Amino acid sequence: MSIVLVALLTTGAVDAAPVSYNEIVETRIRPQVAQLLEGLATQGRRYVIDGTAVFSGDDPFLPGKIALGLADILLSVPADDPRRPAYIAEFRRLAALTVDDPNDTWGIYYYVSALEKLRKVGALGAAVDRATLAKLRVRLDWRTFVDVDDFTLIDHPNNYYGVAFAIARLRVLLGWEDAAGSERLLTKMLEHYRQFSGTYGFADETDGEGRFDRYSVLLAAEIAQRFIETGSRPPDEVLGWVRKSADVMLARINPHGDGFEYGRSIGPYGTTAMVEVLTAAAAVHVLNEQEMALAYAYVSRAAQYYADFWLNARTGSLDMWDQGRRTDAYRGKFRILGENLSVAHQFFYTNAAWNELGYRGKPPMPDFERALDRLPKRMVTWFARGEYDRVLLTLRDRDYVIGLPLINGGESQHMHSPYFPIPFAPRLLAGIADGNSPQLVPYFTLGDGSVLAPLAYFQDVKITTRGTTTIVTFRQPRVDKLGGRAPVPDGRITLTSTYTLSPGRITRADVYTPREPLDLKGIAMEFATYAEDGTQKASTVRFAKGPVQEFKATGFDQCLTEALHDNPDYRTPIGPFSSKVSCRIESRTLREPLTLGWSLAYR
């Protein structure tokens, strides 16, 4: 385990004197971005960061992120600052340099946002030459990914309606089109949100399959920010969604600055998702005074955590890819400059919002940890009910925030462990980005070669409490047949399951029932963990080091414990797992109900 990860896992509540959000952003994050952009200005297309060529052609958003990053730095200095003309000249040169490069969807939004910022301060004409601006007016258009006949998205998930809407609104402000397109896109965006969120207020990333993740909670805040950015008030309906998203994120506030815990694109984006939602909620005035204080204290800790953990002093870059860390292939290291710029922008614009609210230079609340102790210990967030239930249980246990999502990863994500129906908690329990190993769920390999797993189809979810213990029960009338891009329901096995969560311990008990005798090649389950130095006795493993103290599996033929030695297949967003417990059942015919389970205790 790396020294950096050891320090992260063993750190208790933050002891350093609280520093204002503005101070961290302006003294730690903005100088880091300015240094990267200085390297870009010096090296141009030859620019390399930590051995990675910036202009590889693989980042479809890079020109827009460069434009927004330059605008963020340019506008952070006063108009009479001697650096301002140099920054404007650099923007002009790099705009001309990258104008013909691929720049899609989010990149278009970032670029038009940068241009509107420059227009508002009267710097657009100086920062972009006329020929380049003429090209940009044609290319920075939402119509490149929206069918103008019926306003459906072209090969993009439904959250891209928000991107298209933002581009259209900004084009109106730039004087490039009238408001008709943005109004139609707003209607489509809100229709989708209503259709697939129902009464609960969270966006399904799919057309009703049930993928509710970080982005499902973040999207309401992004929509609100598009209105704020373009100078108007979000509709009341959007404000209601923001409030619901804020509830989810308030339940996740912690003293470390850790972020959202499950699904794709977490790591630093899990942290900034919480920052963006809480900031939007503050900006549209849906938080009370105590919630404002908690939110501000959290965003300050989040910025500190980002600067201390995610920024690499040796390379001068954000690091999501090395030191045993792993992120989605979508955010590979080929996007190194763009990822630096987009994460930093999320801190820049949210810091500006808090400054406008009167928090510039204000230290966070001094009794933050005590205030966290007073937060509710349990919250149940329903995403959908119907043929299948989709829900998120959140528990607070000491410094841990534990999330148990019962959702469906849907097409492209159902087979990846960050979407499994298992507990997640920063620094304690994690999935593996794009990872397919059977983390805390059994995979049934049948005689015909099919692999079945209990991942997607939840019914009759019930959540009850008994003192400090929370009990979750559900059934699955069918399980997920793996191997395809989308989940496939398979009724050859049914499941009834019970989770029991109490302070310091989580237990799962499953009963799998075959509809008819099944030829099994085997059953496999794993538990990969940050804990180290495991000693095994029968099916119980006790760990000498790390957050998990004990793991016990039941119902399996055998379990084996091994050290992982920074195995690339077992890396998580914050660093590598240290150990793995592998449990198996050998080939047999399954005729009767089979009881399997596990229990883990944590420090």
Residue ranges and their predicted role:
Residues 55-76, 101-121, 157-174, 213-217, ...:
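An alpha-helical repeat/solenoid feature that recognizes helix-turn-helix modules
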Residues 134-374:
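Extracellular polysaccharide-recognition and catalytic grooves
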Residues 1-10:
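Bacterial N-terminal signal peptides
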Residues 255, 259, 274-574, 603:
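Extended polysaccharide-engagement surfaces of secreted carbohydrate-active enzymes
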Residues 581-603:
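Short Pro-Gly-centered flexible turn/kink motifs
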Residues 74-84, 119-130, 175-180:
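Short coil/turn connectors between adjacent alpha-helices in alpha-solenoid helical repeat scaffolds
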Residues 16-88:
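Low-complexity, Ser/Thr/Pro/Gly-enriched N-terminal "stalk/linker" regions
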Residues 52-55, 94-101, 146-154:
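Helix-loop junctions that connect tandem helical modules in alpha-solenoid scaffolds
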